[in-house]
């Protein structure tokens, strides 16, 4: 069953004022969030959009094992400066495997396994996320064309498969540090993320 719009409110942040809207799956109770700016009226052109999966360790605890927190903050800054945009914040912790399994995967990474192999050793997919809720959320916000802020070609294709017109990709190369260099290399070499070796 598709997710449903539940509520919206203004949200002042360190990066500017946004609107926060909550959507919920009526069967599972799963909640997803749209953080938007400048969409009080239907947009007349492409809108900056980021599809960001929840990362408690990176987004809330400033973990250096990934680049999720810096990506989220950089996107908020970019959208605030542009005056218009949306972050679809999907509650898909650990690329969809959940927080407990994510920490189990972290323990395997501590032993030298990369982020893909760690998931596979737990008999879990390298990426278990889904994106079918995105079209409903964007349709509610009257967004028809997007400039997608991503390095992940799977997200581009997922939105296109839902009939969303992705007119451009906006690269996002922030957050590299000594603790996540192997993680970024794995995303580039094993998950086909569109990083270049000289991006950082």
Curated annotation (Swiss-Prot):
Keywords, alphabetical: GTP-binding, Hydrolase, Metal-binding, Nucleotide-binding, Riboflavin biosynthesis, Zinc
GO biological process, one term: riboflavin biosynthetic process
EC number: 3.5.4.25
Active site: 127, 129
Cofactor: Zn(2+)
Residues engaged in binding GTP: 50-54, 71, 93-95, 115, 150, 155
Cellular compartments per GO CC: cytosol
Annotated Gene3D superfamilies: GTP cyclohydrolase II
Keyword Nucleotide-binding: yes
Pathway(s) of this molecule: Cofactor biosynthesis; riboflavin biosynthesis; 5-amino-6-(D-ribitylamino)uracil from GTP: step 1/4
The protein's name in its UniProt record: GTP cyclohydrolase-2
Species of the source: Acinetobacter baumannii (strain ATCC 17978 / DSM 105126 / CIP 53.77 / LMG 1025 / NCDC KC755 / 5377)
Gene name of the record: ribA
